[in-house]
Amino acid sequence: MKQIKLIANALLGIAFCLAGTSCQTDAVSTPTVTSLNEALPVGSTRTTESLPFIKGADLSYTNELEDCGVQFTENGVAKTSYELMNSYGANLVRLRLWHNPTWTKYSTLSDVKKSIKRAKDLGMYVLLDFHYSDTWTDPEQNVVPAAWASVVNNTTVLSDSVYNYTLSTLQTLLSENLLPNMVQIGNETNKNIMVADNSLLEPVDYERNVQLFNAGLKAVEDFNNATGKSIKTVLHVAMNPGDANNWVANLKALGIHCFDMLGLSYYPQWQSYTPSELGEFTSKLYQTYGIKLLVAETGHIWTREWNDNCHNLMSKMATGYPEKPCPQLQKDFLVEVKEAVRNNGGAGVIAWAPEWVSSTNVTLWGVGSNWENVAFFDFNNQLLNHGGIEFYSENNVAVTFNVDMSNAGSSAKGYITGEFTADANGNWQIFPMKQVGSSSTYTFTTHLSQGQTGAYYYLSDSVWTARETVPENLQGKWNDRLYQASSTEKEQIISNTWSN
């Protein structure tokens, strides 16, 4: 996460080395590691475990929040963030790992072990995110761990440190039956990585970056070869699709080792492309390089309100969305991202810090959360009603409301309101609908849960006095229309005519 800014089911295979796509296999010298055999033990076989489409949550904050007394509830019943995410369909937990942080006891290897066990106890997969730093890394900061500072200018020795650290971490986790299914080699590595000072992030030294990436990738490969495991590898950037494509091309030209997935951070606050454009890039990336696209971090606001004095990072709505946030639109964005990635052969989608609510937790920037308006919980730590967590579910229906506004006059435009537009306080909001060509028909699509019902009506302008008068024979709830999402279909159209 950029913390400095105030920061059909596609199966995953192991790395695809397509014809015409070179995969460097010896770009880093391999130190001798005596506790790993050079070949598989006699009688063992390489596992070829395939992962399902990933629907994940980065829950790196959970242990700290619980230590601060945070308790999550659903309909008044206390549940952990792990239990809640899993119950709605999340199948993976992403966890950040810092090398040796001195300012916090969290995101250390000891802390991560606790989190991995929690995930595995629920049958969830794990992605371990190596930051290769003692603190946050992102496009604006990427400082080498203090323990490696003396060799920061010797790329060969620094690469050996990366290799040995990555390998020894995996060995330790294997010995405790806590092995991750996926490993991320660096976090939001747009610029130079593992530098002495953040003033050295640019110009980007791709050759140095590739050597360091290869050290981590080679460590995972050697671990897999020696143990028969098949941990998948991820490289991660926070870029738009065009820049990300160029980034991969640069690495390929310099002999990057094979890796399974390209992770993207995708936030409306910093990336303005659409889920549709994300889907196009997902397809292009695999067709060109044989690399799966993983949205390693994403999230969307459900309110612009704050619940503490810690500056919130996000306030923008996704491109093309109404300007008024609500839990339903948070869900809509995440569902669109999921479907765009899955329908184009991508690896999956991970929501970042959906549990990071306001508390007494301490960050480098203050006390509290920079993310409570992006979390899946309200300001009382109650799970949002029809909010972002429902994107994990496969029981969503794309409901399209169509209204013919010809009876409303030539200057009228289409707007909609209803229970699904309710803001953080339960107040309905007015959303603009999109005109279909030059016709009098206006349309709005949202992703409701199967069987979900509620009241709604149309307006001819963006003010409450412009509402339609729904005839008594069309009233389904109060004096309004009634929608009911299908219980069996994935798509549904509700067509109406404006009523005077």
What are these model-predicted stretches?
Residues R46-K114, R118-Y125, H131-V162, S168, ...:
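N-terminal substrate-binding region of glycoside hydrolase catalytic domains
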Residues Q3, F16-R46:
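Bacterial Sec-dependent N-terminal signal peptides
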